[in-house]
């Protein structure tokens, strides 16, 4: 694939084909041809390295990254689990333990594992990779790799990006500091220690919520919720590999090896889409993480399955597809999981009882004060990465990079060390995701702008059957043939606006609770229509490595039952 998209001969052929077209398209077929060729031009220009020197540097960079990832596969991290036992742990397990384990010593063991990972990546090639990335960017006329990636991925300069990020930082700074002060006053100075912070913010509530987020029921709730939203997959084939196992890549992701498009004869080529996670069903919090993964990666899959252009270049997930644009689709879907009316309709315990209002309020009381802090947990990454890639080669020492990480965490998060230390974030290691993390924050800004539009237009989001068709028409159909900003203009009627996310972060607990109460009251009175489609219009396989757990050859309902039985047979109920 990389050889194909980086072939300069193909780029020259596309340019020649475009140059041969008449200045004015005489008919629709010519217009469609021009449209498709422009899509291929954007793809090749985003991925082809014109300079011989840069091509050589890229080859060396790929080797450095391959060596690091090969070594990383052999690294075993350990922590103390819920039962007080030392166990091997994935990044997901470390994160969940930090949030939910009532033992401070156990939480600290997870944090220390992450700190050890920071030192490990610095000792196993990350510094050389940063130097090589900068050399590669300079060979193409950029000051550094961060500037290069922002220009390539988001079609804006780093200065333009930081005009947005600086504005958001200023809008949410006081809310973040206020939350930390209040937490320290309530729990003492130790509350902001990195192994305590996440637990005190949400740990006890997460444990109480756990019984309402059955891991085994997660698949069924995803299918039902997406059906009620009117989301369909246009005949796509999807394979979901959701559970952790040794040697598996430790970060959820979605990949489409066969992009969707209409071929030259006008026949529909449905997408083939795989997504993965590393859930541990018997760990507290795993059910909530699982359904978040299903909504998030399922949102990506819905996006790529619904790109209806005349070439596959428009529906593949790499450049020129903007990360922020792609993440808007997935993060919009997983944002619904925080809505009180969604929780009331779907979050149920083993007896089928709905989550009580009091627990929803407790969740808001626990999380709303730290809404700004949560978003700033994303914000800190681009501040760190921009400064990192501005370092000279001589400055790139382990001690200086660690000092930079701690300085950024103090300035943006307000704590000496973040609960997820910066250099333990896997996105920084991979060429595709490095210097791109800001895309998540830009996406969440677009998510809240999108949510505000649907709330103005319809009054609600959960199980609103108008949402799937609207997203398909305005956000998904044209794929990367339209800019992120233009998708927002198409649906909401206004350009990119960070105000909606900042306003949500700055809400008080009482304001957020009143909004939640209003949603629940309206939902109780609403007559929800039945889904118009009988299923998600997809062939779905649930696997665990090479083992087939369940599929929907009979029906989505049968698949969900198979999955539930499989999980129940292999994992005891999590500790409550």
Where are the language model's segments positioned?
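Post-HExxH zinc-binding segment in Zn-dependent metallohydrolases
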Residues: 165-174, 319-358
């Amino acid at each position: 694939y990389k050889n194909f998209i980086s072939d300069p001969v193909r780029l020259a052929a596309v340019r020649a084909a475009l140059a041969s077209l008449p200045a004015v398209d005489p008919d629709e077929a010519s217009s469609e041809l021009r449209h498709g060729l422009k899509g291929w031009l954007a793809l090749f220009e985003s991925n082809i390295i014109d300079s011989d020197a840069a091509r050589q540097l890229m080859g060396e960079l790929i080797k450095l990254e391959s060596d690091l990832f090969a070594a990383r596969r052999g690294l075993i991290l350990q922590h103390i689990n819920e039962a007080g036992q030392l166990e091997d742990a994935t990044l997901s397990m470390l994160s969940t333990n930090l949030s939910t384990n009532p033992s401070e010593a156990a939480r600290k063991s997870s944090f220390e594992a992450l700190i050890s990972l920071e030192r490990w990546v610095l000792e196993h090639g990350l510094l050389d990779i940063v130097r090589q990335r900068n050399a590669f960017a300079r060979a193409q006329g950029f000051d550094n790799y961060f500037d290069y990636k922002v220009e390539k991925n988001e079609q804006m300069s780093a200065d333009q990006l930081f005009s947005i990020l600086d504005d958001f930082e200023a809008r949410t700074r006081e809310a973040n500091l206020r939350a930390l002060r209040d937490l320290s006053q309530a729990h003492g100075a130790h509350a902001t220690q990195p192994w305590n912070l996440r637990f005190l913010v949400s740990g006890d509530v997460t444990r109480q919520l756990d019984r309402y987020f059955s891991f085994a029921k997660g698949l069924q709730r995803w299918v039902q919720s997406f059906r009620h939203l009117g989301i369909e997959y246009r005949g796509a084939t999807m394979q979901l590999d959701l559970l952790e196992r040794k040697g598996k890549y430790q970060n959820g992701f979605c990949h489409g090896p066969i992009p969707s498009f209409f071929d030259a004869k006008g026949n529909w080529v449905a997408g083939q889409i795989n997504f993965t996670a590393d859930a541990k069903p018997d760990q507290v919090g795993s059910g909530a993480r699982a359904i978040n993964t299903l909504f998030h990666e399922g949102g990506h899959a819905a996006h790529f399955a619904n790109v209806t252009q005349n070439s596959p270049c428009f529906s593949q997930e790499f450049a020129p597809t903007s990360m922020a644009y792609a993440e808007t689709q997935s993060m919009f879907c997983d944002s619904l999981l925080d809505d009180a009316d969604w929780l009331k309709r779907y979050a149920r315990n083993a007896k089928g009882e709905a989550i009580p209002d009091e627990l929803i309020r407790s969740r808001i009381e626990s999380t709303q004060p730290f809404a700004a802090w949560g978003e700033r947990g994303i914000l800190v990454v681009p501040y760190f990465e921009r400064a990192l890639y501005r370092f000279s080669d001589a400055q790139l020492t382990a001690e200086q990079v660690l000092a930079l990480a701690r300085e950024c965490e103090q300035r943006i998060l307000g704590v000496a060390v973040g609960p997820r230390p910066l250099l333990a974030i896997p996105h920084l290691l991979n060429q595709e995701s490095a210097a791109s993390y800001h895309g998540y924050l830009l996406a969440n800004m677009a998510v809240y702008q999108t949510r505000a539009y649907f709330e103005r237009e319809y009054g609600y989001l959960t199980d609103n059957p108008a949402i799937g068709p609207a997203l398909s028409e305005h956000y998904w159909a044209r794929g990367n043939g339209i800019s992120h900003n233009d998708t927002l203009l198409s649906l909401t009627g206004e350009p990119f606006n960070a105000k909606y996310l900042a306003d949500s972060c700055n809400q008080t607990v009482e304001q957020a609770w009143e909004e939640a109460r209003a949603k629940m009251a309206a939902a109780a009175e609403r007559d929800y229509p039945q889904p118009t489609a009988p299923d998600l219009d997809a062939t779905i396989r649930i696997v665990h490595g090479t083992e087939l757990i369940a599929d929907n050859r009979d029906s989505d309902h049968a698949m969900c039952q198979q999955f539930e039985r499989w999980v129940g047979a292999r994992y005891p109920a999590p500790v409550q």
